[in-house]
A protein has these predicted regions:
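Domain-level signature for soluble enzymes in the chorismate/prephenate branch of the shikimate pathway
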Residues: 1-91
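Hydrophobic anchor at the beta1->P-loop junction of P-loop NTPases
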Residues: 95
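P-loop (Walker A) phosphate-binding loop of NTP-binding proteins
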Residues: 98
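ATP-binding Walker
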Residues: 101
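Walker A/P-loop
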Residues: 104
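ATP-dependent small-molecule kinase phosphotransfer cores
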Residues: 120-170
């Protein structure tokens, strides 16, 4: 059996191969992004993502660590999608509507689709104030809460590639 130093050296070589492969993959992703931009092709192509996942599943077969490899691969796909969305989709998405119409549900779907960060305004305001929204209303009043919403909206103008799920009163 190999000694521990030799095994660690083998792992280092594997890591080097992984890093080189990722660098090459992300370079190709940049080329795909450029091609999509030049030719007006949609950012999201779910059929291509499914084809890639099927390829990996077929390649892994009944491999003992299949679930772990799939998790890593899903992360690679997510990061690849994020690179594309940041290049091709250079703005924010604001979801506005009454309470309970599904802004949070839609923001999660958009997050999966475009690999963008989500800002749930009510959650951010509650966290910043260390209390629930109803407690903020009770303690500080609606005017204070609306000022907090406005402040957060202004802050979001300075960010790119985010999905903002606005509170029901925006």
């Amino acid at each position: 059996m190999k000694d521990l130093d030799k095994l660690r050296n083998d792992l280092d070589m594997c890591d080097e191969i992984i890093v080189d492969a990722l660098r090459m993959r992300y370079q190709i992703i940049q080329e795909v992004t450029n091609y999509k931009q030049e030719n007006g092709i949609e950012i999201v192509q779910p059929e291509e993502e499914e084809r890639k996942k099927k390829f990996v599943l077929d390649k892994l077969g009944d491999y003992k660590y299949k679930k772990s490899v799939l998790k890593v691969y899903e992360s690679i796909l997510y990061r690849s999608k994020r690179i594309q969305s940041h290049e091709l989709f250079d703005f924010n998405i604001f979801l506005i509507g009454f309470m309970g119409v599904g802004k949070s549900t839609i923001s999660k779907a958009l997050q999966r689709t475009f690999a963008m960060d989500v800002v749930e305004m009510d959650e951010v305001i509650a966290k910043r104030n260390g209390m629930s929204i109803s407690e903020i209303f009770e303690l500080h009043g609606e005017e204070y809460f609306r000022e907090e919403e406005t402040k957060l909206l202004r802050e979001s103008r300075n960010k790119k590639n985010i999905i903002v799920s606005c509170g029901g009163g925006v």
